[in-house]
Amino acid sequence: HSGKWYWEVHALAIDNDRPNLYIGLDEGRVLDHRIINTIGSGAIATSRVYQSNGNGTKTSNNESAYGGTWSDGDVIGVMVDMDAGKVYYRRNNTIESSGAAAFTIDVNTSSFIPSFGVYEDAASADGGNVMTINFGQDSSFAAGLTSVGAQDENGIGDFKYTPPAGYVAFCTKNLPEPQCVPKDNFGIVGYTGTGVNGAAENVITGL
């Protein structure tokens, strides 16, 4: 639970009449396809999201003012500071709400996963929302934009905008090398025998 991580979302099409897009985090232990309940009346308590319709952030059923209303073509940058337990957003390379954190997360008690989706309530139609996520693999967002090739401070990633200082692409290339590797800590044991029951018929060889 450490480090500062960055990824981007291209809001290709926005329909804010309802439903609306959301980008955020959910606790990794929650096995559910939703961040926010799709009927709007019992939102999952572990969700923390930024909404496209101008209603700010949403944590469970509580909304707080933050940022603004998204438009077609906006690129939302997500900045997760696991060291400080805070999450920030940029829209078209401008940080939202004058740099205030969108919400806080408790990194000591929970694990979080990036999550994306549509929030709707019982009165919502299906809408026409489309978004593409870039963890540093393609700044064109599958040919939706002109490729830029911005990288993090480690020279990793292909982003629309350069990640802020200290933030790196949320990908395996930026993870530390594991201290415990199979070749140093595990051995292979082979068993040969005649197929007859009894330990005396089996020969054990370590490789």
Give a label for each model feature.
Residues 1-207:
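PRY/SPRY (B30.2) beta-sandwich protein-interaction domains
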